[in-house]
């Protein structure tokens, strides 16, 4: 019988192998560029393993758009909330100026723990109905989120 740790590691190794087959959301690079030019900075907080997160970001050529990449040191997603709280304390601007954009209920939980606004996107694996129960703005795409931030 496999342990949870073995199953988690096996799952993530399979997931990692699929990164080259993944695509960015339509217009993602242009959206990052436009928001950066408008004065927004970007951080990436993920339940992905830190080293793998950096490799994936580099694979897609996105590192220049982020002031910080924050992943986990294991595969169990136990400390995404803790990492978010730590990061918000380190940011050089007030949390009222931070918007957490995510696509999962857990992203809402992290944003709430950080004390920041949250926008949830329906492009993940949770339904609009599930996301709307959080009581925050729910949009269908990254471009819609960018439009809201810019207008």
PLM segments and residue spans:
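Short amphipathic alpha-helix with an adjacent loop that forms part of the alpha/beta core around
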Residues: 145-151
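A short, structured active-site edge motif that brings together acidic residues
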Residues: 63-78
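Phosphate- and divalent-cation-binding pockets in alpha/beta enzyme and binding domains
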Residues: 27, 52-55, 110, 130, ...
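Acidic, Mg2+-coordinating phosphoryl-transfer loop and its flanking beta/alpha structural elements
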Residues: 99-139
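Conserved H-loop
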Residues: 63-67, 94, 139
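Short, acidic loop-to-helix structural element flanking the phosphoryl-transfer center
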Residues: 13-44, 50-57, 81
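Short beta->alpha linker loops
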Residues: 23-27, 48, 75, 103, ...
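Conserved Lys-Pro-Asp/Glu-containing loop-to-beta segment of HAD-superfamily phosphomonoesterases
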Residues: 80-112
């Amino acid at each position: 019988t496999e342990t949870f740790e073995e199953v988690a590691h096996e799952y993530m190794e399979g997931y990692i192998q699929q990164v080259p087959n993944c695509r960015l959301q339509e217009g993602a690079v242009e959206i990052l560029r436009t928001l950066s030019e408008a004065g927004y900075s970007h951080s990436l907080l993920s339940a992905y393993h830190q080293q793998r997160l950096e490799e994936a970001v580099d694979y897609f050529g996105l590192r220049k758009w982020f002031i910080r990449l924050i992943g986990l040191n294991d595969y169990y997603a136990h400390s995404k909330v803790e990492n978010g709280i730590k990061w918000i304390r380190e940011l050089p601007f007030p949390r009222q100026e931070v918007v957490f954009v995510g696509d999962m209920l857990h992203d809402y939980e992290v944003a709430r723990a950080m004390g920041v606004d949250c926008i949830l996107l329906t492009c993940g694996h949770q339904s609009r109905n599930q996301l709307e129960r959080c009581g925050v703005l729910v949009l269908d795409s990254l471009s819609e989120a960018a439009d809201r931030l810019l207008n």
